[in-house]
């Protein structure tokens, strides 16, 4: 199955860029910020680059504060904003010098990092700056772009991914082993850049890609260039079709089993959930793979997705010609096993992480019913659809890697 129909298109338009500058000048915003909004939207509107709040961008510029002084600031994507429809308030300005002052600090907890970033906002009412704010600050370029490009994850999320990256991306790119987003990742990036000041791109294993330049168009062009390189490299690999289970019919429709699934989701007095059903050609291919229980449980395409879809789906295989009653008893067992598996997963990983963590409810966010389709789960319809969109992307990336190699994600931590 082909992951991409076409090589990624560069959508930059000088005319539209100038229109953004004029529009935002009237609203009191600089051309720096206007162009940042423009290319952030260009990146955010391509679903093969980012989805639903994923990715981030920044620009280093100067802003006059209420005291009349000019401050060097980092305007970086804030939480709660999507790149696809960002506005200047979605790029909160953080004073740059206090961020740079921590370059040599050895450790900063997530809580202290968030507090420090908020303390240095120009406008305290702004949204929280990205968890990757320090990373953006430590790269000495005006414009920094970050996406979770499907094609890049296809290159990184496989055995030998590190060497494959070196071969694909060339000598202007540094490859970074996986580090959880936050201050320690920013420190690692600073260390790598200091040793390789000629690079214009970073590939973060199992995470995504950063490109940077002092010109907005150039940073965007670099993103398109390197993601296109990844696309071309994957297209050249030898591929094999994934073995599929046999097609069979059941004596029920998706809409008949939806109430059963919804009831089981709330069976242990968890919050009430909404579910969304979908099926398309590549989801069908993913769900009906003989090895779906193996490859779907290895991890999401990028850790960002875990927040919305949990680390693994629940999978149900109905029996041939099974009735709705038979499906119900099959589903009850599957849900019981999933809840036990999730509790085990949390307990194992909780011991490995500093600080106290609170376990979420034990209900799945994605249910794959073979020969039927996918049911995505959320607290409302929008959240359920987002879980579905992310699973759609995970299905594309995982099956594409499985066709050419073996899907591999970061070890559990």
Question: What are the residue ranges of the model-derived segments?
Answer:
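Glycine-rich flexible loops
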Residues: 7-413
